[in-house]
Amino acid sequence: MSYLDGRGAIPSRGVIPAARVGIAQRPTVVNNVETLSHLALLARRGATWFTEAGAPEAPGSTLLTLNGDVHEPGLVVEVVGPTTVGEVLTTYGRVRATPRAVLLGGYEGTWLPGEVAWRLPVERHRLSKLGASLGCGLVAVLDDEVCGLAQTARLVKWLASQSAGQCGPCIFGLPTLSEEFDQLVAGRSRKGDLRRLRELATSVRGRGACGHPTGVVTLIESALDTFGPELKSHLRGEVCAVPPGGRGFELPGLEERP
């Protein structure tokens, strides 16, 4: 939108919604492919037919992308409620047992213990009441042979490299958060480092020119809350109890970046 409005192609977090004031100071609607597909079905078959599927508060289907320790990482599935995250992973991901943890909502989403995520409904309005979100629709299963903190460190490093370079919290805050998290995972944290990491995350939250820094903070804070046993081991400088060799999440271009 910024580019189309004659400005730099960088993200922004406007105080006034684009639906009220957008390009050329006029109301602007931005839709994703899922919304457009729903509009096509509405136009073809009508509202009565459309509302027969899904929940009354959120009719229609939901697109989800499965990742991590599933049968086919990257698989996009269309689900119609009522259903749960566990049912989706069992049916489409061929996940046979409750995983240790699930990352819900994207790489800037929320880590949840597997037993918690398993029972969650795939309904955006209900998830928001439970403090979770479908976000971009990613459901990523943590491999039992991958440390959740090490996986998070990879994600934070990659996300820090994706900065648009337009504000301090992104330019300076995210690389610092990545470095601090790497130190924790490597078992080199000293007394007070965890507190400093949490304080830095708090200071970055909500301060960026867009939502990118806040999303990274959400990922970090949920990891610290979800992976308690691993966190204690790393803080003591012990070898991680999770054996190496598992399947990590795909991160385009991470290995090519310095």
Please provide the spans of the model-predicted regions.
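Short, structural beta-strand-to-alpha-helix junction motif
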Residues: 83-87
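Terminal amphipathic helices with adjacent charged low-complexity linkers/tails
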Residues: 94-130, 225, 229
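Generic beta-strand/beta-sheet core signal
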Residues: 67-69, 79-80, 91, 102-105, ...
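Ferredoxin-type iron-sulfur electron-transfer modules in oxidoreductases and energy-metabolism complexes
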Residues: 3-7, 13, 120-258
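Secondary-structure transition/capping motifs at alpha-helix termini
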Residues: 93-98, 187-191
